[in-house]
Design a protein with these regions (language model features):
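N-terminal, intrinsically disordered, basic low-complexity segments enriched in Arg/Pro/Ser/Thr
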Residues: 11-13
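Bacterial N-terminal signal peptides that target proteins for export
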Residues: 1-9
Length: 163
């Protein structure tokens, strides 16, 4: 009798624990208002600057008007696997090594993408609108500071693609 009472108690306890009702929530598949796909962009070519390096790619400037931000995305090919590659936007055309306007996240050589996030965010709400008249270029450096690749942007080059 002792064994059957114990078995009954275990069964009742198990039923009590596993019979808790849980709500299964359906996933929300709608984007929040103002969220979703970025559709306005300008893309510029990044080319190798040295015969020893065949690093190339694109820099894309995405407009996010609801947040008054510009997202910068860098995608490179043939990057050295084990290196972090610094990225800077400099004033002037390629060859006019003037002052650095700003630096983004480094590119991870293993992926060819920015290391910290897919996008570098520029919070200046006028940056995207002034991009076509911006006198600047982008440089990609190796770990020793040597320029591997560069590309004119803004007034120094026509976008290779835009929307």
């Amino acid at each position: 009798m002792k064994i059957s009472l114990r078995n009954i108690f275990i069964i009742l306890l198990s039923v009590g624990l596993f019979s808790c009702e849980q709500d299964r929530l359906e996933p929300e598949l709608e984007a929040a208002e103002g969220g979703g796909t970025l559709t306005s962009y300008m893309a510029y070519t990044i080319s190798s600057v040295d015969d020893d390096s065949d690093v190339y790619g694109r820099v894309v400037f995405w407009n996010e008007p609801t947040l008054s931000q510009t997202f910068i995305q860098v995608s490179l090919y043939n990057t050295p696997d084990s290196e972090m590659l610094p990225v800077s936007i400099l004033n002037g055309a390629i060859g006019d090594e003037s002052s650095v306007s700003f630096s983004t996240y480094d590119v991870d050589g293993s992926t060819g993408e920015l290391s910290d996030s897919k996008f570098y965010v520029v919070t200046d709400d006028s940056f995207y609108d002034s991009l076509m008249t911006l006198d600047a270029h982008i440089n990609i450096y190796d770990s020793t500071g040597t320029i591997l690749a560069a590309g004119d942007i803004g007034s120094n080059a026509d976008p290779v693609e835009s929307n």
